[in-house]
């Protein structure tokens, strides 16, 4: 394996334009704004071949847990051990008890070699929903969250996921639309991403409550391209397909190490994104 010709250095905002070219070449939907958002809550490394970025890896700390994400290697630099090297270098930046990631088919062999184990599956759905067919909503069930709600929603998220995501929820409070089930029994987040908007996380006590959250958000985004990543719930995925979304991919979730299982009557129905868990 030959990696000595690549200069691996910390990922800074100056690298976003080069990273954008790399993700676009890989067919990923991220905009420059999406890279900037990820970098604002993460640390990372880039591999340079001269003045060209040929690989990236980010790590996003959430207390005892972290995700490793945006692992991309330029096609011409593959097969030289660069993916493993930049991933390991990025992971050395922080020391959580547990690592999580979402694996593509092409990335899974590398992650398994690094000790990651399969923990579940993700259903990626996207498209334009039909607001006329969405779940019946009572106006008393849901409301838009305010900044005063964010601390409570952060605690709900922590209880459901085991992730301490203070910085992410500060971002949500400023840049996302957040709907909350009255009685604080769940919430959903929608924000700009890629070709349109992404819905996630969605946290609720039941699939019926999750459908209410989705219906509320889908009705507010009629005509807009929407993506969501459902966490292993086939029934919810089928229902979303009935609302007009299309299942386009089914990657797997993987983990290395353990921080213990969260104990809560709240359930995660959709992750924030494949990068952010």
At which residue positions do the language-model features occur?
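A short, well-structured alpha-helix characteristic of acyl/acetyltransferase catalytic modules
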Residues: 1-3, 12-22, 133-135, 147-156, ...
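Active-site rim helix/loop that mediates acceptor-substrate recognition in acyltransferases
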Residues: 16, 20-56, 158-178
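Conserved beta-strand in the GNAT
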Residues: 46, 52-60, 65-72, 184-198
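Conserved acetyl-CoA-binding loop-helix of GNAT-fold acetyltransferases
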Residues: 73, 79-92, 113, 207-219, ...
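Conserved GNAT acetyl-CoA-binding A-motif
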Residues: 93-105, 222-232
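Active-site/acyl-donor-binding loops of N-acyltransferases
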Residues: 103, 114-133, 203, 227-277
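Amide-forming acyltransferase catalytic core, primarily the GNAT-like/NAT-type
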Residues: 116-198, 208-209
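Flexible loop/N-cap segments at domain edges
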Residues: 186-191, 197-232
């Amino acid at each position: 394996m030959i990696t000595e010709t690549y200069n691996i250095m910390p990922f800074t905002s100056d690298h976003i334009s080069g990273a954008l070219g790399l993700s676009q070449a890989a067919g990923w939907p991220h905009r420059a704004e999406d890279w900037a958002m990820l970098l604002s809550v993460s640390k990372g490394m880039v591999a340079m071949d001269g003045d060209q970025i040929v690989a990236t890896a980010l790590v996003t700390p959430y207390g005892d847990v972290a995700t490793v994400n945006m692992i991309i290697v330029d096609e011409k630099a593959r097969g030289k051990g660069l993916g493993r090297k930049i991933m390991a270098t990025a992971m050395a930046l922080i020391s959580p008890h547990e690592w999580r990631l979402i694996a593509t088919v092409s990335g899974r062999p590398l992650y398994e070699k690094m000790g990651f184990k399969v923990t579940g599956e993700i259903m990626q759905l996207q498209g334009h929903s039909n607001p006329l067919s969405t779940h019946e909503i009572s106006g008393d069930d849901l409301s838009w969250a305010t900044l005063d709600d964010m601390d409570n929603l952060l605690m709900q998220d922590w209880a459901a996921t085991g992730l301490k995501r203070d910085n992410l929820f500060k971002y949500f409070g400023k840049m996302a639309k957040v709907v909350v089930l009255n009685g604080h029994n769940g919430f959903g987040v929608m924000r700009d991403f890629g070709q349109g908007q992404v819905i996630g996380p969605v946290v609720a006590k039941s699939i019926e409550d999750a459908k209410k959250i989705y219906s509320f958000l889908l009705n507010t985004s009629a005509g807009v391209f929407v993506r969501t990543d459902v966490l292993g719930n086939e029934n919810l995925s089928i229902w979303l397909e009935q609302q007009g979304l299309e299942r386009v991919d089914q990657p797997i979730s993987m983990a290395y190490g353990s921080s213990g299982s969260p104990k809560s009557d709240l359930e995660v129905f959709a992750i924030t994104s494949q990068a952010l868990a």
